[in-house]
Amino acid sequence: MSERKNLTDYVYKMVASLVQVGVENVVVSPGSRSTPLAYAVASTKQIKMYRQVDERSAAFFALGLAKATAKPVVLLCTSGTAAANYFPAIVEASYARVPLIIITADRPHELREVGAPQTINQPHLYGSHVKWSVDFPLADGAAPTLPFIERHIARAVAIATSAPFGPVHLNVPFREPLLIDLQDELPTMTFKHSSMGQLIPTTSAMQELSSILNSTRKGFMIVGELALGTDLAFLWEFVRQLKWPVIVESLSNMRAAVPEDCLPYLVTTYDAIMKSEDFKALVQPDTVLRIGAQPVSKFIMQFITKTQPSAYVIIDEDPMFRDATGVSTHFIHANIDQWLTHLTLTNTAFEESYLAEWQKANQLASTYIEQYSEIEKDEGAMVSRLLKMIPDGSDIFVSSSMPVRDIDTFLLATPKDIRFFANRGTNGIDGVVSTALGFSQGNDRETYLLIGDLAFLHDVNGLIATRYQECNLTILVMNNDGGGIFSYLPQSTVEAHYEDLFGTPTALEFQDIAHMYNMDYVRVDTIAELSGKFSSVKKRPLRLVEIFTDRAENVQAHRELWNRINAELKA
């Protein structure tokens, strides 16, 4: 059998195996060593191919696409540093629990570690940041090779999509020549199915948890960012049964489209009210129940650490014990819909006055936040008004740093159906533009990106993807000329070197970038302009709204809001 036929059979078996296990999307970056597999992907009707020349941005694009679809997305690149450029997004996918199938083309084994060009040590390149890694055989025509491909790709996708989701790495060596014969049909498959099952809690664990909850006098629940594809109906029913205060982080997506009968239990202003020592003294808990990831607010976590409740129970699909407080007493590793159906709640011991204290504080803080958005002119007020302007049925991708914190502060419970997403696995500001672009590709809802100026600059390369596929996205850039979050941190009290090291102003404006990428552009200088300018930017698929704010005014206005709420809670 010829080398060309061996290679053709090999790569089409790979593509057929991916299609067999439900892969629909592949993000490809150009390169020579990945030629055979890239040709096979491009010629397969069952696969949608996306292109991005920058591998770092390509990986974040794939991350966003996987977030939107809750399905595994394949990344394909050539050998060498191309594969290394995937690393930041792989780290984020690992901690954010996003399924990626990373395929790195490689030199054949005889060219490794001998100084061959564009060759690095690629097997197991990503270390502990992938759930599984395997080095594939060459397309040598040996009888075991094609069955190996079928089973290992099925295994890779099963691992990536088992709880917790995460990335896997397939390193695939190709020997020259690299051209194949293009095929119209995929080969027949012999391996049919691979599944990893669900995480079901033990009966004893559920009995113990039921006992803890039913004996609690004072307790609250926290819902953080949840696993992709989580059905919120289970959680809403649990809220109705539990009847406790429920602290809902914005990324839980339980602040929007809220069922009316669940509204009395929701606490959305927890970050503001947790700054009050008087309020914290009133609501010392016996029990804290946390579902999903740790919330954005450090103040609620500091409160738990300091109070050390008798029971701090974490229920999560991730077995890595995500508890930075160090005071958890129970960890239950299970799928959310599984543990809920096993609980028996009576609530006989719970004190309704405890819920009333949370309700009173939340209502007070909500009133001040509503007033703030009407009278202030800073970034927070801008965000609050944008949340009212963005139409029902939209999704908002939010950058780390100040945007995600402002969403957490200013998003109150609403009947509007708006969902929020972010890269909070490792909380970085890198790759956010690309992630949002990928997210918009996998999403049939209108999509917005809320981002700061430095995070936008960090991933301007991500916009290259818009030259290869039409992207429907409105980018809202809060341009405060630097790193606004540091103004809230102790570093801001030391004037020497502050601007050089932390403020890092660039004095850049983004109209020329918008022009370069054929984006609709509007500039907003004042809050009075916001409504009219925002509604006017609808002409092109890709839109940029640049909103100018002042870092010093932002931090002053935020602190005045917190001080007003604190003073009222003290009274």
Curated annotation (Swiss-Prot):
Keywords: Magnesium, Manganese, Menaquinone biosynthesis, Metal-binding, Thiamine pyrophosphate, Transferase
EC number per UniProt: 2.2.1.9
Pathway, per record: Quinol/quinone metabolism; 1,4-dihydroxy-2-naphthoate biosynthesis; 1,4-dihydroxy-2-naphthoate from chorismate: step 2/7; Quinol/quinone metabolism; menaquinone biosynthesis
Cofactor: binding comment: Binds 1 thiamine pyrophosphate per subunit.
Coiled-coil residues: none
Chloroplast among keywords: no
GO molecular function: 2-succinyl-5-enolpyruvyl-6-hydroxy-3-cyclohexene-1-carboxylic-acid synthase activity; magnesium ion binding; manganese ion binding; thiamine pyrophosphate binding
Keyword flag Transferase: yes
Domain of life where this protein originates: Bacteria
Gene Ontology biological process terms in this record: menaquinone biosynthetic process
Classification via CDD domains: TPP_PYR_MenD, TPP_SHCHC_synthase
Entry cofactors: Mg(2+); Mn(2+); thiamine diphosphate
Transmembrane segments: none
Pfam families: TPP_enzyme_C, TPP_enzyme_M_2, TPP_enzyme_N
Reactions the enzyme catalyzes: isochorismate + 2-oxoglutarate + H(+) = 5-enolpyruvoyl-6-hydroxy-2-succinyl-cyclohex-3-ene-1-carboxylate + CO2
InterPro entries (alphabetical): DHS-like_NAD/FAD-binding_dom, MenaQ_synth_MenD, MenD_middle, THDP-binding, Thiamin_PyroP_enz_TPP-bd_dom, TPP_enzyme_TPP-bd
Subunit composition and interactions: Homodimer.
Family label: Belongs to the TPP enzyme family. MenD subfamily.
Function: Catalyzes the thiamine diphosphate-dependent decarboxylation of 2-oxoglutarate and the subsequent addition of the resulting succinic semialdehyde-thiamine pyrophosphate anion to isochorismate to yield 2-succinyl-5-enolpyruvyl-6-hydroxy-3-cyclohexene-1-carboxylate (SEPHCHC).
Protein name (record): 2-succinyl-5-enolpyruvyl-6-hydroxy-3-cyclohexene-1-carboxylate synthase
Source species: Lysinibacillus sphaericus (strain C3-41)
Lineage of the organism: Bacteria, Bacillati, Bacillota, Bacilli, Bacillales
Name of the gene this protein is made from: menD
